[in-house]
UniProtKB/Swiss-Prot annotation:
This protein's name: Peptide methionine sulfoxide reductase MsrA
Enzyme class: oxidoreductase
GO biological process: cellular response to oxidative stress; protein modification process
Organism annotation: Xanthomonas campestris pv. campestris (strain ATCC 33913 / DSM 3586 / NCPPB 528 / LMG 568 / P 25)
EC code: 1.8.4.11
Chain's gene name: msrA
SUPFAM superfamilies (alphabetical): Peptide methionine sulfoxide reductase (SSF55068)
Function (record text): Has an important function as a repair enzyme for proteins that have been inactivated by oxidation. Catalyzes the reversible oxidation-reduction of methionine sulfoxide in proteins to methionine.
Family label: Belongs to the MsrA Met sulfoxide reductase family.
UniProt KW Oxidoreductase keyword: yes
Disulfide bond residue pairs: none
Gene3D superfamilies according to UniProt: Peptide methionine sulphoxide reductase MsrA
Keywords attached to this entry: Oxidoreductase
One GO CC term, this protein: cytoplasm
Active-site residues annotated for this sequence: C54
Amino acid sequence: MLGIGAFKQRMPRSGEALPGRTQALPLHNTHLINGHPLRGEFTGLAQVQFGLGCFWGAERKFWNVPGVYTTAVGYAGGKTPNATYSEVCSGQTGHTEAVLVVYDAQAVSFEQLLRTFWESHDPTQGMQQGNDVGTQYRSAIYCSTQAQYDAAIASRDAYQQQLTAAGYGDITTEILYPAPTFYYAEDDHQQYLAKHPNGYCGLGGTGVSCPIGLDA
């Protein structure tokens, strides 16, 4: 039998993923910072999912961006439906810790969000982010439209040039369209650093500026 550590650097294969559950985890559907719903139809607004390491600090990066309507943290990109945090930490779900960003495209461009994403973490680290090691910390952009996907790919290629010039390796960010199912995380993880101001935040960027979104 494989130990939990076996799944820290690789995705679970067929038959290895935890079964999960059909029922969604309980959720208090109000954003602690802005009072907007965490879950809904969001008619007239755009959505994207970002994975950039521990989602506690990652969510704060985006709720502070003007034009963002709401944010929520959850699990995406894996195999286990409605996984719990402890299950995701085992590495046996295949999920990454993700932030759902719902935004008004008339108030903030997707390119501006991409710039925040790239500059807020090191996207060259594979299945880890800093001292946080595991598949749940991999870098990811899960797109809801083809236009988002095209922009994400273009931004990756542009940022790769800057990173290469600064001595970094290849970007390992997983970019997908259509976006996989987003499973909301437990209540305590939502807006975690607002509830726990001295809570852990292991995010750290490369210090390399992203050349997109500068004039948006």
